[in-house]
């Protein structure tokens, strides 16, 4: 079992047997209000070989020359179509796809990407 809290960030993604789950349970972002009104914990079952991918908004909000966002749908498609046997290969596939997508646009926000596989 994995217990988590999402504090207003992009939802981490869990992938198991080509089933994708967005980890959205949590609350408002830390520091957004003087007091946090409510925090909920999420609990999910984690099977062996489950992937967890965490990323910052700079990844999915990166624009290309046409002003189009990279977006969640594109990220999910890349994850499901990639060789996820090794996290380094998955991360490289995502970053190369983003670099190709953005064309000549500069990066305007930080991008962080973390992935792991539960054994």
Where are these regions (language model features)?
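Conserved subregion of the PPM/PP2C metallophosphatase catalytic domain
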Residues: 1-119
